[in-house]
């Protein structure tokens, strides 16, 4: 049975499933759909064609699904789709998609968006990600699974961050980040690999292979793109080569350049 505060303003066209909790002074618009077990604390605003997945919890003063902050937006149909078991903290803002993008903003499962996170139109966020306080995503950004982004980080539109990456706090990121990398700075650059996440997701032999692969990719000669092409030719059947090198070759913004501090020996430091 759902529990809905008397002061909540809910459109009769909104769809509310079983076990939903809606707190005081929430505003729920026409096209909103809340799946089982969703919990809205007080003063949450949901508008537009917004779907919230099972057991997602949204905290006070978060605003989801309002008109994209894009001057090209002319009122066309677009969506915001949020998956299951997410925590969306106070004052977060998440916009739907636009005609100029994929017409939707997508957020996967089991993510934590801390206070004051902004997710602009047409972004795609995977699952098991943590976006710390004040993270700002411009439009059309793609973030893979198991990504951590430190507080007060700003990310340029169309940037892609691959699986297992970590972005240090107060970074300004304008280029793509390949799988399992850590980046830091303004403008952010690759500092090394995310050993903590790799140990959680991969076997030791695969971690060794990936470290060796990145050492070869980041040699001064040939270029990064040429190195990626050579690796794909020589290791066509290796899934990690495919994942990492294809990501590099598909980059339109370029890859965050390698720091001189990067070393394949980092893995042995602990």
Curated annotation (Swiss-Prot):
Homotrimer. Keywords: Acyltransferase, Cytoplasm, Lipid A biosynthesis, Lipid biosynthesis, Lipid metabolism, Repeat, Transferase. It holds the Pfam family Acetyltransf_11. GO terms for molecular function: acyl-[acyl-carrier-protein]-UDP-N-acetylglucosamine O-acyltransferase activity. The gene is lpxA. This is Acyl-[acyl-carrier-protein]--UDP-N-acetylglucosamine O-acyltransferase. Belongs to the transferase hexapeptide repeat family. LpxA subfamily. Its EC number is 2.3.1.129. Signal peptide: none annotated. Involved in the biosynthesis of lipid A, a phosphorylated glycolipid that anchors the lipopolysaccharide to the outer membrane of the cell. It is found in: Cytoplasm. It comes from Helicobacter pylori (strain P12). It catalyses: a (3R)-hydroxyacyl-[ACP] + UDP-N-acetyl-alpha-D-glucosamine = a UDP-3-O-[(3R)-3-hydroxyacyl]-N-acetyl-alpha-D-glucosamine + holo-[ACP]. GO terms for biological process: lipid A biosynthetic process. Pathway: Glycolipid biosynthesis; lipid IV(A) biosynthesis; lipid IV(A) from (3R)-3-hydroxytetradecanoyl-[acyl-carrier-protein] and UDP-N-acetyl-alpha-D-glucosamine: step 1/6. It is an enzyme of class 2 (transferase). GO terms for cellular component: cytoplasm; membrane. The keyword Acyltransferase applies.
């Amino acid at each position: 049975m759902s529990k809905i505060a008397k002061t909540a303003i809910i459109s009769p066209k909104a769809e509310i499933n079983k076990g939903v909790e809606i707190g005081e002074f929430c505003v729920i618009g026409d096209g909103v759909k809340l799946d089982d077990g969703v919990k809205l604390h007080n003063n949450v605003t949901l508008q537009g064609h917004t779907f919230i997945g099972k057991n997602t919890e949204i905290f006070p003063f978060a605003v989801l699904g309002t008109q994209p902050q894009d001057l090209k937006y002319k009122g066309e149909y677009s969506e915001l789709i949020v998956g299951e078991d997410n925590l969306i903290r106070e004052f977060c803002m998440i916009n739907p998609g636009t005609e100029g993008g994929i017409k939707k903003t997508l957020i996967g499962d089991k993510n934590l968006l801390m206070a004051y996170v902004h997710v602009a139109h047409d972004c795609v966020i995977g699952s098991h990600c943590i976006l710390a306080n004040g993270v700002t995503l411009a439009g059309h950004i793609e973030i893979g699974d198991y990504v951590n982004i430190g507080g007060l980080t700003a990310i340029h539109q169309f940037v892609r961050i691959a699986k297992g990456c970590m972005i240090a706090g107060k970074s300004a990121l304008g280029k793509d980040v390949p799988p399992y990398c850590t980046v830091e700075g303004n403008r952010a650059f690759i500092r090394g690999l995310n050993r903590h996440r790799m140990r959680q997701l991969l076997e030791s032999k695969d971690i060794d292979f990936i470290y060796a692969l990145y050492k070869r990719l980041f040699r001064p000669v040939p270029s990064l793109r040429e190195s990626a092409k050579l690796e794909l030719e020589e290791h066509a059947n290796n899934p990690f080569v495919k994942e990492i090198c294809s990501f590099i070759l598909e980059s339109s913004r370029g890859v965050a350049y390698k720091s001189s501090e990067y070393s394949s020996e980092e893995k042995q430091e602990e």
